[in-house]
Amino acid sequence: MNQLDALRQWTTVVADTGDFKQLAISRPQDATTNPSLILKAVQKPEYRPLLDEAVSKHAGKPLDEVIDRLLVRFGTEILSIIPGRVSTEVDARLSFDTAATVARGERIVALYKAEGIDTEKRLLIKVASTWEGIEAARTLEQKGIRTNLTLLFSFAQAVACGAAGVQLISPFVGRIYDWYKKSAGAQWNEAASAGANDPGVKSVRQIFEYYKQHGIKTEVMGASFRNVGQIRALAGCDLLTISPELLAELAASNEPLAHALDAKAATGGDVAKVSYDEAGFRFALNEDAMATEKLAEGIRAFAADAVKLEKLMQESGK
């Protein structure tokens, strides 16, 4: 049995890509997209017609709506291939606006419903894990709209998401690893910081065990992997969203895979339950330099790619 099939025994495998033509190869249950992945996809000749079609079909509509329609087009193509759910992201420029995030999430849901998609079972609305984003997700969940809280780098963010009753969180393993590696500079010891000792892996394990111990139903989906060692160290996590390149690497390996995270074992933990009001959340996040920097950086990057996507659309419409 290869490692990808072994992983499927304990973990729902999710493909992290906008390149839906690769999905038939890796056979994931779910798929995730983000503005950067869609931007990357539409720059390939085989996907450029989707962008041109969105622009020509919806000429005269606001660019933000045309982008949402493009995201939904990619999402519906993905859903025609996979059996499970797709995650579609709200514009990162709305990360600090609760009401606008709710409105955009509702619009994306309406667009999927117009395509005949059962959104309650097959769609997750991705929202940045800011205080405003988490509160927007709380409202969306109360309306029956399932959410995926992304750009999650800290325990405080995970606690707030669990309290809000969100469907799923996406802690970013690789970006946490990147920060600690850069921060350590010449002192970084790769061997000593690999596998279970990887700072990103440790963060996900802490969140996973806390959720299971306290009966929090929110699903944990490790994301943003830099190497297969990080994935192997999280075998047993509820879900893992993995790039096509790393999925292929797992499929090519027949080395034994250990069951690293055990939900049943985690229920016996003794970590006290934590709660945050807005002030407490903001202070806890501020105390975590890595999470503060990576959250801000991630929002900036996704927002910049949304702007690039708008520019491509403007050029296409000329």
Curated annotation (Swiss-Prot):
The keyword NADP does not apply. GO terms for molecular function: transaldolase activity. One of its GO terms (cellular component) is cytoplasm. CDD domains: Transaldolase_TalAB (cd00957). The keyword Transmembrane helix does not apply. One of its GO terms (biological process) is pentose-phosphate shunt, non-oxidative branch. Keywords: Cytoplasm, Pentose shunt, Schiff base, Transferase. Its main location: cytoplasm. It catalyses: D-sedoheptulose 7-phosphate + D-glyceraldehyde 3-phosphate = D-erythrose 4-phosphate + beta-D-fructose 6-phosphate. Disulfide bonds: none annotated. It is an enzyme of class 2 (transferase). Its EC number is 2.2.1.2. This is Transaldolase. It comes from Variovorax paradoxus (strain S110).
